[in-house]
Curated annotation (Swiss-Prot):
Protein name: Protein translocase subunit SecA
Subcellular compartments: Cell membrane; Cytoplasm
Any one GO biological process: protein transport by the Sec complex
Source superkingdom: Bacteria
Subunit-structure text: Monomer and homodimer. Part of the essential Sec protein translocation apparatus which comprises SecA, SecYEG and auxiliary proteins SecDF. Other proteins may also be involved.
EC number: 7.4.2.8
Membrane topology qualifier: Peripheral membrane protein
Binding residues for ATP: Q83, G101, E102, G103, K104, T105, D494
Family indicated by similarity: Belongs to the SecA family.
Keyword terms of this UniProt record: ATP-binding, Cell membrane, Cytoplasm, Membrane, Nucleotide-binding, Protein transport, Translocase, Translocation, Transport
GO molecular function: ATP binding; protein-exporting ATPase activity
InterPro entries the UniProt entry points to: Helicase_ATP-bd, Helicase_C-like, P-loop_NTPase, SecA, SecA_CS, SecA_DEAD, SecA_motor_DEAD, SecA_preprotein_X-link_dom
Length: 837
């Protein structure tokens, strides 16, 4: 992509937004003279206009004038031109890059109102519950003024509270709670228990953090533990016996593998002749995780060990881009257990994944998606290619006065820390507030100890002390304040400077290490110089920093003659730093792109499964689905009853025996009626007998109860087979790169295997459902456990490969409108139940 193609769309979008914003500003005086009721009436008129399928574009200026005036009347804040421009860009579904302190909270209320006019629900997504609370508290009085409702979602809410809040015109929520609620909604066994009403429009605050930094970490809901823990300890003990020559470690990809000598040791340790034999797949899996846990994951960097509420040591994951603890999250596929074994703390059994989704897949489900952040332009290509959003940099309301000093580069960390402390002492004596950014919890603790030695009072904000995040950052601009923060740097919380701090030079941001992304560094710099304030930034870097040790080892030799114990700042190192960061950014983008290529396969299957569940839960008569499943089962029974596979000659006795064993059980099926029939007549006759048999079951009860039992059986079978599918496909994906002998691209292998497994899933659901219906004898009981083991050759089923359309399932899948109408009906029922109670 050349420079012109990158810039032109941004300029075009920005110019369009600027023209609209200027029209809004021209009408300021006109709207000042409207009464409160007149503004409300105008807003209601637009809602009615849109309800008649008219576009908002024709009323966009009027809508912006209304909400701008209401914000002023409620909060005494008048939206600046740049805030209006940002709102317009987000309204059209693009990514607005707005610098820190430019008023994103107000901008988001503008655009939330614009989309709420459609009355379809707007999700305002941010990274933590503090920002949810701040955003909702600012928006609520404004939108209530216009008779719109605002909700907020927190993790401790019950189902009823969440449903009411999601049913508001605008709902503030965290990205994690949004994702988990989506997964939980697609695990319900009663449609009325869903809490979300659909995914129409999402605005993602801190969009780069959610859509880029967290893209590789899937949301996972786990089921019951599936295996013993002893093998994790054994694998960890083995790895701790290895010498450097027994394994290889690639610093760039952080991949680690056994060498030939390591494999020989593994064979002796685990008493096996061939380490790579298929029967050793579990050993290989656990040893691989133990290698990663011991050599690429470190306490204080990727995770910390902390106490839980019961005083037990636990592993808490650290978000690499923010430094925050990722509450409630754990590594999957056994890596969490490997780290627990390494740290010699209680090992939790590995749980089976019952539902999972990545943020990439989640947000691509929305009909309309937009985002806002202070830093995004360096990832513009990725946002366009993956999310179809153009990143547009919004001009600041006031010129930026921050001075970004050249980097200081040192040979080693010891010298770097010496100069950092010297700089802090000098600035602190002058009263200048200082924010020091570190790349890890470990570095923040080192700096804390060094500052204590020189008696400089300071605050520390890292994953061990994140509870006071907003409070610590809010005070970071006070006179003589010194604040140490990991990469989180209090995103979403303004650092306001006192008059004394401004006189002392404004906030100085000191970076103690370059991250692997220019965007993360820009986030740290951007804490200073907000809204035209003065400020400074400088990075102190050593050749021992992670960025160099992992990604620039080939270039370090060239730097030897340019370094000494003294500070160095040269064009050579600036170029080396920038090139290294670009290299890492490219690697990370390729990783995320690869992730979405793989995830696209599972995403399509997930969507089909979830829509089929909705169809079953909504429908009052699921026999049409049962009969399509029956068609597939009958085809398989007939296929196995052929005397010769390539001929239409059927062994009637074998067919009747199989049908009796799997469907009719002790009920009599007259095989004499089948003799003399042609191939297609046999199929028709068997289906008719099965349907008659099922109808006899239905006559033992009401149609409603029969459908309820049928639904329970179908949902239970779908969920059970989907869980197995997730487990198997995840293991295939983990090992697909080792299958080079097939001479196919790993992705192609994964697609082929996953498609075959999904066909098997559909066959298993069909067989289990049809066989279970045959077992029904009506009593009041839970039929979800009524799963039958079918007595057929599973390999023959797969060879026959008669695809169940969850095929024509496409014909029966409900539309979004149908789902919404059902949601509304169930919502009314829930309200009635609540009122009656």
């Amino acid at each position: 992509m050349n420079l012109i193609s990158k810039i032109s769309p941004q300029n075009r979008i920005l110019n369009r937004a600027r023209l609209i914003a200027e029209e809004v500003l021209k009408k300021e005086e006109e709207y000042e003279h409207f009464s409160d009721q007149e503004l409300i009436n105008k807003s209601d008129d637009i809602i009615e206009y849109l309800a008649n399928n008219n576009p908002l574009d024709d009323k966009l200026v009027e809508a912006l004038c209304i909400i701008r005036e209401v914000i002023y009347r409620v909060h005494n804040k008048r939206a600046f031109k740049v805030q209006i421009i940002g709102a317009i860009i987000v309204y059209f579904g693009d990514f607005a890059e707005m610098m820190t302190g430019e008023g994103k909270t107000l901008t988001l209320v503008l655009v939330a109102y614009l989309n709420a006019l459609y009355k379809k629900g707007v999700h305002m997504v941010t990274v933590n519950e503090y920002l949810v609370k701040v955003g909702a508290e600012f928006a609520t009085p404004v939108l209530n003024f216009l008779n719109m409702s605002v909700g907020q979602i927190t993790a401790n809410m019950n189902e009823y509270e969440k449903r009411n809040n999601y049913n508001c015109d605008i709902t503030y929520t965290t990205n994690s709670e949004l994702g988990f609620d989506y997964l939980r909604d697609n695990m319900v066994t009663n449609y009325a228990n869903k809490v979300q009403r659909g995914l129409w429009f999402a605005i993602v605050d801190e969009g780069d953090s959610v859509l880029i930094d967290e893209a590789r970490t899937p949301l996972i809901i786990s089921g019951e533990p599936q295996e013993e823990i002893g093998n994790y300890v054994k694998a960890d003990r083995f790895v701790k016996t290895l010498y450097p020559q027994d394994f290889t470690l690639d610093p760039e990809s952080q991949s680690v593998a056994l060498t030939e000598s390591g494999v020989e040791k593994a064979q002796k340790f685990f008493n096996t002749k061939n380490y790579y034999n298929f029967e050793n797949s579990d050993i290989i899996h656990k040893v691989t995780n133990a290698l990663r846990a011991n050599f690429t994951f470190f306490n204080g960097r990727e995770y910390i060990v902390k106490k839980d509420d019961d005083g037990e040591d636990i592993i808490a994951l650290v978000d690499q881009s923010t430094g925050r603890i990722m509450e409630g999250r754990s590594y999957s596929a056994g890596l969490q257990q490997a780290i627990q074994a390494k740290e010699q703390i209680k090992i939790e059994p590995e749980n089976l994944t019952v539902a999972t989704i990545t943020y990439q897949s989640l947000f691509r489900l929305y009909k309309k998606l937009a985002a806002v952040s202070g830093t995004a332009i360096t990832e513009a290509e990725e946002f366009l290619n993956i999310y179809n959003m153009v990143v547009v940099t919004i001009p600041t309301n006031k010129p930026i006065k921050r001075i970004d000093h050249p980097d200081y580069v040192f040979d080693n960390k010891r010298t770097k820390w010496k100069y950092v402390i010297a700089d802090v002492i000098r600035r602190h004596e002058n009263g200048q507030p200082i924010l020091i950014g570190t790349a890890s919890v470990e570095d923040s603790e080192i700096l804390h100890q060094l500052l204590e030695r020189v008696n400089i009072p300071h605050e520390v904000l890292n994953a061990k002390n994140h509870a006071r995040e907003a409070e610590i950052i809010a005070c970071a601009g006070e006179y003589k304040a010194v604040t140490i923060a990991t990469n989180m740097a209090g995103r979403g919380t303004d650092i306001k400077l006192s008059p004394e701090s401004l006189e002392a030079g404004g906030l100085c941001v000191i970076g103690t290490e370059r991250s692997d992304s220019r965007r993360i560094d820009n986030q740290l710099r951007g804490r200073a110089g907000r809204q035209g304030d003065i400020g400074e930034s400088r990075f102190f870097i050593s050749m021992e920093d992670t960025l160099f040790s992992r990604f620039a080892t080939d270039n370090l030799a060239k730097a030897d003659d340019k370094l000494s114990e003294d500070v160095i700042s040269t064009k050579f190192f600036t170029r080396l730093l920038n090139n290294t960061q670009k290299k890492v950014e490219s690697l990370n983008y390729d990783t995320r792109k690869n992730l979405i290529d793989y995830d696209h396969v599972l995403s399509n299957q997930r969507e089909l499964i979830y829509k089929q569940r909705d169809k079953i839960l909504i429908s009052s008569d699921n026999k049409d689905i049962l009969y399509r499943m029956l068609d597939s089962v009958i085809d398989d029974l007939i296929y196995q009853s052929h005397n010769k596979p390539n001929e239409d000659i059927i062994d009637i006795k074998k067919l009747i025996d199989l049908a009796t064993q799997n469907i009719f059980y002790d009920n009599y099926l007259n095989q004499d009626e089948y003799y003399g029939l042609k191939f297609e007549q046999i199929k028709t006759k068997l289906k008719k007998d099965c349907i008659n048999f099922f109808e006899q079951k239905e006559q033992l009860m009401t149609p409603t109860i029969f459908n309820q039992i049928l639904s329970e059986i179908m949902i239970s079978n779908i969920d059970e087979e989907w869980t197995k599918h997730l487990d198997i496909t995840s293991k295939i994906r983990e090992g697909v790169n080792l299958r080079a002998y097939e001479q196919k691209a790993p992705l192609n292998i994964y697609v082929e295997d996953s498609d075959k497994l999904f066909e098997k899933l559909k066959h298993n659901v069909a067989w289990k459902t049809v066989c279970s219906i045959g077992k029904i004898n009506y009593v009041h009981q839970d039929y979800s456990d009524l799963n039958s083991e079918f007595i057929v050759n599973d390999n023959e089923i797969n060879e026959n490969n008669n695809s169940i359309d969850f095929e024509n399932f496409n014909e029966s899948i409900p539309t979004d409108q149908t789902i919404q109408e059902s949601f509304d009906d169930n919502q009314s029922d829930n309200e009635d139940d609540k009122n009656n109670n």
